[in-house]
């Protein structure tokens, strides 16, 4: 029985805007991979996130994610959401990944703030069937899964890295450094492509 279960690839799915990707994302993915014995973590940059307004073009966010994850052999990046036309919904992401890897057991990695809103997500009942959800704690967030199916949701505390993409964008816009908040290659990409500079 144990051998049969383990013979199924265990794949983490780390969806996000990644605008920009930072060390907090990478640490969370690494901690979940270790705790849940994942074979791989697929980072999925959103195409056009339905819950957010203006974001950096998807191709920039995809390339920054590729740069940030390149040194970890367990990390890969998928274009499934970037190439989809229209808004990005988690249910579409998981359906597409399940179709690509029907033999895999999927673990969707999300933050405590997002898991609190999950009951408002599209086709939530199908979400539970497609993946196990892992909610990672962020500094200042209380984790609670009351009202959610306990067998489909796990909580995991990760090292407290108080980094946010919003703060990273703001620092760049104010001419402040983001070294050590985001991977070195991403810092260079942001500078080369003049991202997050205010045009107002």
Curated annotation (Swiss-Prot):
One of its GO terms (biological process) is NAD biosynthetic process. It catalyses: nicotinate beta-D-ribonucleotide + ATP + H(+) = deamido-NAD(+) + diphosphate. Pathway: Cofactor biosynthesis; NAD(+) biosynthesis; deamido-NAD(+) from nicotinate D-ribonucleotide: step 1/1. Its EC number is 2.7.7.18. Keywords: ATP-binding, NAD, Nucleotide-binding, Nucleotidyltransferase, Pyridine nucleotide biosynthesis, Transferase. The keyword ATP-binding applies. It comes from the Bacteria. One of its GO terms (molecular function) is ATP binding. The keyword Repeat does not apply. NCBIfam families: cyt_tran_rel, nicotinate (nicotinamide) nucleotide adenylyltransferase, PRK00071.1-3. Belongs to the NadD family. Catalyzes the reversible adenylation of nicotinate mononucleotide (NaMN) to nicotinic acid adenine dinucleotide (NaAD). This is Probable nicotinate-nucleotide adenylyltransferase. It comes from Leifsonia xyli subsp. xyli (strain CTCB07).
């Amino acid at each position: 029985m144990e051998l049969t279960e383990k013979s199924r690839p265990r794949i983490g799915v780390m969806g996000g805007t990644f605008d920009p990707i930072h060390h907090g994302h990478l640490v969370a993915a690494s901690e979940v991979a270790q705790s849940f014995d994942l074979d791989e973590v697929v980072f999925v940059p959103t195409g056009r996130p339905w819950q957010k307004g203006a974001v950096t073009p998807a191709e920039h966010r995809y390339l920054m994610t590729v740069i940030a994850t390149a040194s970890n052999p367990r990390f890969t990046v998928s274009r499934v959401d970037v190439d989809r036309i229209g808004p990005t919904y988690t249910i579409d992401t998981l359906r597409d990944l399940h179709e690509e890897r029907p033999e895999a057991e999927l673990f969707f990695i999300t933050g405590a703030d997002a898991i609190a809103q999950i009951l408002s997500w599209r086709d939530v009942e199908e979400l539970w069937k497609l993946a196990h959800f892992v909610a990672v704690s962020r500094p200042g967030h209380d984790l609670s899964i009351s009202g959610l199916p306990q067998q489909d949701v796990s909580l995991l505390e990760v090292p407290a890295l108080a980094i946010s993409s919003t703060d990273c964008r703001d620092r760049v816009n104010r001419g402040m450094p983001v070294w050590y908040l985001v991977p070195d290659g991403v810092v260079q990409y942001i500078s080369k492509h003049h991202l997050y500079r205010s045009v107002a």
